[in-house]
From Swiss-Prot:
Keyword Metal-binding: no
Name recorded for this polypeptide: Multidrug resistance protein MdtK
TM segment ranges: 11-31, 53-73, 93-113, 127-147, 160-180, 188-208, 243-263, 276-296, 314-334, 350-370, 387-407, 418-438
Taxonomic lineage from the root: Bacteria, Pseudomonadati, Pseudomonadota, Gammaproteobacteria, Enterobacterales
Major location category of this protein: membrane
Length: 457
């Protein structure tokens, strides 16, 4: 029991700064929305449309680079720290290549925006302008993620938290300058949010790079030999590990976007109730997601040390802590669901629907916690392909079709409306949780030599 208590302490010490960093990131999005809304409703809508295209594109790159964390954690655990600098250099090369692809996609996103049904031309122009300003921040964001993943792989999650809050502090005044046109800058409205956010990502990257250059704990892994050329072998391995994570993230983000589109014809009340419940549940999701990042670090580190039993302890502890957190957040959601809904909207019909959907959200919080922490465990074992197949099967083969049938058809029961899609979420996330646990058990039952050989690749 003592080893589990000790492991839980170490996990929480890693997870809490990640949670706070995520809070800062969420707050940046909130600040952008509020400040753009203060300028005009059209500008706020433009930021919302632009963000809905930016997120899938940038999260694809973000997911690809997540491969660095278990690689660095494993090298750190095995005492091969001299190899970390080379892995990080290749991470920067990969981030550079992906940045170019993301920027090309975002530059041409106007075709997607202008093809939207009945979109106002002025709104479309502002959304395109916002994206074309924001895309210059893509390299800064992805370079920052490489530096952050280096720190997190070395079990240092506090720098990411500090840089997150630094970004938030810089974002507010820079938004003010570019949205409203102060200090000789042009008045750009919502487009100014894109300029400000792009600048903030570069500030966060430069600050993180400065920390890495001067931190005593990283003195032995600093790159003293210049940047070097791309290493095709290392980059191929990073892509093999990272691409399934990137695709899994992409499928998850697009699933919720597709559901939002399917809900939109059902009416204003249904859309508002669905959006409130989804927004609140995404805030609760920050807890298990951050814990999953910590579990990846601990499992990778323990495997690097050559101890499959300690890796199992880290995995089980992460699941135990995650389930406890999910039970607490589920009770909180059920108890206060009406009060929470009232914070968003005071329309009685919207509040009633949001409260009903939050009951379903409380049910899936436990499954969601298990599946995302399970994903973190599998990342630690460098078994990322299974994450992609499980995510795709659970969300797109089981969750979305069953949600569609329950919500919009009479095949099984009378049309349930938005609640049907939420039943689909429960089916999809529970399926993902079960499949993640089965895969984890399969991996852990393999001989130690095979587990360690895979982890060392």
């Amino acid at each position: 029991m003592q080893k589990y208590t000790s492991e839980a302490r170490q996990l929480l010490a890693l997870a809490i700064p990640v949670i706070l960093a995520q809070v800062a990131q969420t707050a940046m999005g909130f600040v952008d929305t509020v400040m753009a809304g203060g300028y005009s409703a059209t500008d706020m809508a433009a930021v919302a449309i632009g963000t809905s295209i930016w997120l899938p594109a940038i999260l694809f790159g973000h997911g690809l680079l997540l491969a660095l964390t278990p690689v660095i954690a494993q090298l750190n655990g095995s005492g091969r720290r001299e190899r970390i600098a080379h892995q990080v250099r290749q991470g920067f090369w990969l981030a550079g290549f992906v940045s170019v692809l993301v920027m090309i996609v975002l530059w041409n996103a106007g075709y997607i925006i202008r093809s939207m049904h009945n979109i106002d031309p002025a709104l479309a122009d502002k959304a395109v302008g916002y994206l074309r300003a924001l895309l210059w921040g893509a390299p800064g964001y992805l370079f920052f993620q490489v530096a952050r993943n280096q720190c997190e792989g070395l079990a240092k999650t506090k720098p990411g938290m500090v840089m997150g809050f630094l970004g938030l502090l810089v974002n507010i005044p820079v938004n003010y300058i570019f949205i409203y046109g102060h200090f000789g800058m042009p008045e750009l409205g919502g487009i100014g949010c894109g300029v400000a956010t792009a600048a903030v990502y570069w500030v966060m990257f430069i600050a993180m790079l400065s920390y890495i250059k001067h931190a005593r704990s990283m003195r032995d892994i600093r790159n003293e030999k210049g940047f070097g050329k791309p290493d095709s072998v290392v980059m191929k391995r990073l892509i093999q590990l990272g691409l399934p994570i990137a695709l899994a993230l992409f499928f998850e983000v697009t699933l919720f976007a597709v559901v939002a589109l399917l809900v939109s014809p059902l009416g204003i009340v249904d859309v508002a109730g669905h959006q409130i419940a989804l927004n609140f549940s995404s805030l609760m999701f920050v807890l298990p997601m951050s814990l999953a990042a910590a579990v990846t670090i601990r499992v990778g580190y323990r495997l690097g040390q050559g101890s499959t039993l300690d890796a199992q302890t880290a995995a089980r502890t992460g699941l135990g802590v995650g389930i406890c957190m999910a039970v607490v957040t589920a009770i909180f959601t059920v108890t206060l669901r009406k009060h929470i809904a009232l914070l968003y909207n005071d329309n009685p019909e919207v509040v009633a629907l949001a409260a009903q959907l939050m009951l379903l959200a409380a049910v899936y919080q436990i499954s969601d916690s298990i599946q995302i922490i399970g994903s973190g465990i599998l990342r630690g074992y460098k078994d990322t392909r299974s994450i992609f197949f499980i995510t795709f099967t659970a969300y797109w083969v089981l969750g979305l079709p069953s949600g569609y049938i329950l919500a919009l058809t009479d095949l099984v029961v009378d049309r349930m409306g938005p609640a049907g899609f939420w039943m689909g979420f429960i089916i999809g996330l529970t399926s993902a949780a079960v499949l993640m646990m089965l895969r984890m058990r399969y991996l852990q039952r393999q001989p130690s030599a095979i587990i360690l050989q895979r982890a060392a690749r």
